[in-house]
Amino acid sequence: MQLNSTEISELIKQRIAQFNVVSEAHNEGTIVSVSDGVIRIHGLADCMQGEMISLPGNRYAIALNLERDSVGAVVMGPYADLAEGMKVKCTGRILEVPVGRGLLGRVVNTLGAPIDGKGPVDNDGFSAVEAIAPGVIDRQSVDQPVQTGYKAVDSMIPIGRGQRELIIGDRQTGKTALAIDAIINQRDSGIKCIYVAIGQKASTISNVVRKLEEHGALANTIVVVATASESAALQYLAPYAGCAMGEYFRDRGEDALIIYDDLSKQAVAYRQISLLLRRPPGREAFPGDVFYLHSRLLERAARVNADYVEAYTKGEVKGKTGSLTALPIIETQAGDVSAFVPTNVISITDGQIFLESNLFNAGIRPAVNPGISVSRVGGAAQTKIMKKLSGGIRTALAQYRELAAFSQFASDLDDATRKQLDHGQKVTELLKQKQYAPMSVAQQSLVLFAAERGYLADVELAKIGSFEAALLAYVDRDHAPLMQEINQSGGYNDEIEGKLKGILDSFKATQSW
């Protein structure tokens, strides 16, 4: 059978039409060196700063150094089996983590994968770990409080929603305890919490998670974990991942609280990465951009106005402001707050709570030093009653510290000085508080009112603790409606003052402590 030319041309056309050409462009490179979790790649032409690079075995690295003929990247995860000559590909994507309400009550790693054995995590989408902080026009001033439940903090160093308040002190001074109690106190406040654990022991983190669960606070908390055994890259990225999860709530007109425990370890991890990438070291061998490392993270904690929230949600949420409050923790060495990282973070934040080891060892817990602890914007957010009653507390403590130092040398003191010393000692005793026992605004107000109005003058120093416990039990039993009213309104007027005075007068008459 012979085919004529027309049939041949038709057949060729048919074959051409059916021919399937699949071409996929890959930006591919070759690993030229692997050392301590850092890989150097040759041949990646169009790589972005911070881009995820796909490695063999379903792993990723992040491109941090873009040089003329090679790319320096840090591996997220195990790197022992990576070898010279392996092929890697650009993904064209920046690192993203899952965000949403489904993460609440879960323990996840830096990449948002669950590590609590409770199955997969529900998410409402993904967010880039690096985001630009809201601009000046998008922000609103801080004027609503975040109650930590600690008398010493809420009275003298108040924290507002959208503020960045540093918790700084040596190791074993109660920094994590203060942060965890702040989370426990948000149980019924509607504030969502994110706890980021950086470079800590897995056993310590499991204790924290258990305590949060025991006190019913885990249900509205996301725990992001990068343990000490994980790579420096994951420890460096953990705070940014946690921040992205917190921004989800902030941008939808809700309030969130994030704790970074602690940023000293993140700075050390970043220093390790930078030195391995052969970046020039500066002071204390930290790279030149260690200030920017923390400033770009902490600037993302802000209170955003209703217009920003409305624009972000495309009109779904109207008339609501959102906030992300940050409590970064920094560990000092022998109380040296003038080291490089502490001074950086002090200058970035809106105040600091300074915890001292000698106060902690003397049994004053929380070991807050009121002399150098300050809240630069929290005063505007304090409830009216706390603002009114806490004014004299700081003054009393400042005068007491001054007189205590002076009285060591003076043999005979006049009555006024003796009274001031006695009052200062009692206020110091009154501000002591046990862990996992946060107090409501009404309870704190009542105790501060007793100190302010001289109700402690005839109470022995050793009995201050039992006086406080008996007073709180008395009001819970007989005056619960007033406590509820103060908790809801936070207001202070002559009527409330009269009622508080009446409660204390009748309680003092019982002598039940």
From Swiss-Prot:
Protein name (database record): ATP synthase subunit alpha
Alphabetized PANTHER family for the sequence: ATP SYNTHASE SUBUNIT ALPHA, MITOCHONDRIAL (PTHR48082:SF2)
Family: Belongs to the ATPase alpha/beta chains family.
CDD domains: ATP-synt_F1_alpha_C (cd18113), ATP-synt_F1_alpha_N (cd18116), F1-ATPase_alpha_CD (cd01132)
Tree of life domain: Bacteria
Gene3D superfamilies with a match to the protein in the record: 2.40.30.20, ATP synthase alpha/beta chain, C-terminal domain, P-loop containing nucleotide triphosphate hydrolases
GO function terms (MF aspect): ADP binding; ATP binding; proton-transporting ATP synthase activity, rotational mechanism
Disulfide-bonded cysteines: none
Alphabetical list of Pfam families matching this protein: ATP-synt_ab, ATP-synt_ab_C, ATP-synt_ab_N
Record keywords, A-Z: ATP synthesis, ATP-binding, Cell inner membrane, Cell membrane, CF(1), Hydrogen ion transport, Ion transport, Membrane, Nucleotide-binding, Translocase, Transport
Site (Required for activity): S373
Topology within the bilayer: Peripheral membrane protein
Subcellular location, record wording: Cell inner membrane
GO cellular component, one term: plasma membrane
